[in-house]
Each structure stands twice: as C-alpha cells, then as structure tokens.
Design a protein with these regions (language model features):
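Active-site phosphate/pyrophosphate- and oxyanion-stabilizing loops and adjacent acidic/basic residues
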Residues: 39, 107, 138
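Alpha-helix N-cap and loop-to-helix initiation/capping positions
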Residues: 65-73, 132
Length: 156
C-alpha cells in the first residue's frame, strides 16, 4: 500500500488530493508503476487519471504523418496502462498523441487538461556511474506549471 501525505505533515493538513492527474507512459516498468501510483493517490480524492503516450515525429515527416506501426505500439502501451490501473481497481482514460517533442506535448496536455500533478516513472540508469535523468523528465520538471512527481524504479 502506498501512503501519500502532505508536505506540511506537522501542520495536520489533510493528505494531498488532486482533481486531475496526468501520467505519461512509454511501456516501461517504471511508467506502468507510475500508473499504479497515480491510481492509488487518485482513489483518495476521487481524481481523474489521464494517461498519455506520445509518439515523437521526426522533423523529416509531417506532424500528422501516418505512423501505423508506432500507433499500434502506442495502443498496446495504453492497454498495458489500463491493465495496471485495473490491478489498482481504478478506471483511467488514455490518449495517443503525436508531437515533435514528447516533453512539450506532456506539458501542453497537462495545461489543456488543467492537471494538478504529473506523475512520471523513470528508470534507474547510471550511464557514467551517476544517476541521470533523461531528456523528457528533465524538460517536464523544468517547464510544467503543476506539481511533478518522478517515481524512480529501484536499482537491480
């Protein structure tokens, strides 16, 4: 069970609650764990959980290019997210997006949906001996107008 408490724990405020939670997914274990985490905190406040998968479109292609293979893979990822939510006994909605830059698309989606928080799963990677965040979570952390939670997977 996951417990989420206010950052003002000593002040006896109620646990954090959110109206709208955005969870970007890429099919990794970390992103699916983020879906489960988001559902566990959403249940507390009867929040909406919206899951997005962003297909990054190369500049050589039109933004609305037909990317059938990528779209099929994206639909599979959204199905995996729905299964993860069902394990938490929670209903989510999902959307497949095409954009030049996934980080910008995630932030734009959070703004459009008036999300209170973005929950992102990040893998534990140490490419040069140090833990390092990849481009997308770094960009979301820098530019999102709402709270952002990064859920890092444990080291293996």
């Amino acid at each position: 069970m996951i417990n989420v408490f206010s950052r003002h724990e000593k002040s006896k405020e109620a646990p954090l609650s959110f109206r709208s939670i955005l969870v970007p997914v890429d099919g990794s274990d970390a992103s699916l764990r983020a879906v489960e985490f988001a559902c566990s905190i959403a249940r507390r406040g009867h929040s909406k959980v919206h899951v997005v998968h962003v297909i990054e479109v190369r500049r050589a292609l039109r933004l609305d290019a037909d990317l059938t293979e990528e779209a099929q893979r994206g639909e599979e990822i959204l199905t995996q997210a729905e299964i993860a939510a069902k394990r938490q006994d929670y209903q989510i909605d999902g959307e497949l997006l095409q954009a030049r830059d996934a980080g910008h698309a995630i932030v734009d989606e959070a703004i459009e949906r008036d999300s209170d928080i973005i929950v992102m799963g990040v893998p534990y990677t140490r490419p040069f001996g140090e833990f390092e965040l990849s481009r997308i979570p770094t960009q979301v952390m820098k530019t999102a107008p709402c709270e952002v939670v990064l859920l890092r997977m444990p080291s293996e």
